[in-house]
Amino acid sequence: MTKIAFIGVGKIGQTIAFNTIMDGYADEVMIYDIIPELPEKFEHELRHALASKRLKVELLSTNNLDDVAGADIVVITAGKPRKPGMSRRDLFVDNAKIMMDLANKLPKKNHGAVYIMVSNPVDMMASVFARYSREFVISTGDQVETMRLRAYIAKKLKIPVYRVNGFVGGEHGEDAVVLWSTVTVNGKPFSEDLGVTKAEVEDYVKKIPGEIIRVMGGTTWGPGTIIAELIRAVALNENKVMSIATPRQFEDEIIHVSVPTVVGSSIGPSLENLLDEKDRWNLMASMKDFYNVYKENLKHLETSIQAQ
């Protein structure tokens, strides 16, 4: 029996939950949000969609976090959304306080679940939740960037996207790095002779989220589908290779930075050792930068809490 809980059902939470439920494999789905009536009305929408597809999924909607219990997978999308012109790191203090509260409450009735962090800045929120909950947390990491990479190369070369492989790693967002030693086209290593440059690809992967947010107010459909695929891989033990952020010790903190990793009911191993030297160096540089910013943000968080 697969029991999945969604904590927060704003735009991205709704999209992920909808895609997950329409897959039809979940036995029970719990929907929580702090906004009155939102979970209940969203449940009605889901029931109508399930009726159309003739699918049977038990649904529970609630504004009471205590009702969320016994989940195998907990997907956290709660928090303030990223607005136009705002970096993911700008969100840190406000959303970290939410994660601290959830970390104190959720494990009491969901101990041993796999926690999947979606709230931005996602890798830092995963690290905060793990720090205060001591539970196993993964971040959706750079799997979204990975799909953007593949989609762009396929479009530029006018080939089916399944002929493009490769991964993005490091911290999710503006500082993500393309792991070029993993990128192949038609099974062969990527070459600029194909008609698209590395710089062009990297520029697209970094800038397209901001452009979508500027026009559409947020990135929803791509991430919503991609993250639902991650949930499915965990729930059904699919053992897919995905670029997610898993916990790792870095100096005195547990941090989350993405590397290609086998994802199933258990997470790992990572494929970091298969990367070339340049990609490994770029990953280490990303980890160091993440750690330094994370530690600085933790200081701001502590100062903000003390000032309350």
Curated annotation (Swiss-Prot):
The keyword Oxidoreductase applies. It is an enzyme of class 1 (oxidoreductase). The keyword Oxidoreductase applies. It catalyses: (S)-malate + NAD(+) = oxaloacetate + NADH + H(+). InterPro entries: L-lactate/malate_DH (IPR001557), Lactate/malate_DH_C (IPR022383), Lactate/malate_DH_N (IPR001236), Lactate_DH/Glyco_Ohase_4_C (IPR015955), NAD(P)-bd_dom_sf (IPR036291). GO terms for molecular function: L-lactate dehydrogenase activity; L-malate dehydrogenase (NAD+) activity. Keywords: NAD, Oxidoreductase, Tricarboxylic acid cycle. One of its GO terms (biological process) is tricarboxylic acid cycle. Its EC number is 1.1.1.37. The active site is at H172 (proton acceptor). Substrate binds at R82, R88, N120, R148. It comes from the Archaea. NAD(+) binds at G8, V9, G10, K11, I12, G13, D33, N95, V118, S119, N120. This is Malate dehydrogenase.
